[in-house]
Design a protein with these regions (language model features):
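Structure-specific DNA junction-binding interface
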Residues: 1-88
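C-terminal accessory module of base-excision DNA glycosylases/AP lyases that mediates lesion recognition
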Residues: 1-29, 137, 144-229
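Short acidic alpha-helix initiation/capping motifs at coil-to-helix transition points
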Residues: 40-46, 113-117, 197-198
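Residues that form generic nucleotide/phosphate-binding pockets
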Residues: 50-54, 67, 71, 102, ...
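Helix-hairpin-helix/helix-loop-helix acidic hairpins
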Residues: 57-60, 72-128
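Histidine- and/or cysteine-centered catalytic micro-motif in compact active-site loops
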Residues: 71, 141-144
């Protein structure tokens, strides 16, 4: 049996490969996440570490966005360019901070998730250039996910407050095309807030049935490993 690497979350098969030098060359210095791995391999835990620093006031929201997009784009050549365009749309980070403010609360409800999604979707509020739902749901996931602590364990993205709360998850084409009809998501890319929330409820239900985290359901779906009951 193949052992899961120490850095991997349950359900995470492999790290994302990134070309660090290309990203460093393209990005403004203030946006580079402090202490971010320079190995060229990124696990979800690495991005959650930046999210934890953001929650604690030790990282800016621009640094969080960069960490998310480096992981999200991976080795895709236009990733750094598109990330710079997004950053230029919010040079002081105020639009992103406004979108994510509800996710910083110790306890947040479904309405906070809906509001964050809608703000990032609306150009009149917080939508940034080159940042559609396939990417901004990654930001919502890393900024807002609360992992149920097992045996008192702690760490990035881990808190006992995760129990019972609806968790934000990634919704991109890789996920959407594998979801069953009962998940409530249309094919396409410009999903409505109601579709995202329907998917979150579906994933939460599947996670409860299987005794796993909701993001493990998302990973299984995106990798084509999800099996229906």
């Amino acid at each position: 049996m193949t052992q899961r690497p120490d850095r991997a979350l349950p359900g995470e098969v492999s790290p994302i490969t990134v070309h660090i030098d290309r990203w460093r060359t393209a990005l403004p210095p203030d946006a580079w996440p402090d202490g971010f791995p320079d190995s060229g391999l990124l696990w979800r835990r690495d991005v959650f570490a930046v999210a934890q620093a953001w929650h604690a006031g030790r990282a800016s929201v621009r640094q969080l966005l960069v960490a998310v997009l480096m992981w999200g784009y991976g080795p895709i050549g236009y990733g750094p360019w598109r990330t710079v365009r997004a950053l230029e749309g919010d040079p002081d980070g105020k639009r992103l901070a406004y979108a994510l403010e509800g996710l910083r609360a110790p306890v947040r409800d479904e309405e906070a998730l809906r509001t964050a999604y809608q703000r990032l979707r609306d150009p009149k509020e917080s939508r940034l250039p080159r940042l559609g739902p396939a990417l901004f749901t990654k930001l919502l996931y890393f900024a807002g996910y609360r992992r149920a602590a097992a045996g008192g364990a702690s760490g990035p993205g881990t808190t006992a407050l995760g129990d019972g709360q609806l968790q934000p998850l990634i919704l991109d084409p890789a996920v959407a095309r594998q979801l069953p009809a009962e998940a409530g998501v249309r094919r396409g890319t410009e999903w409505l807030p109601a579709e995202w929330l329907a998917y979150l409820h579906w994933a939460a239900d599947q996670a409860r049935r299987r005794g796993v985290e909701p993001d493990e359901v998302e990973m299984a779906v995106s990798q084509g490993r999800f099996t229906h009951d």
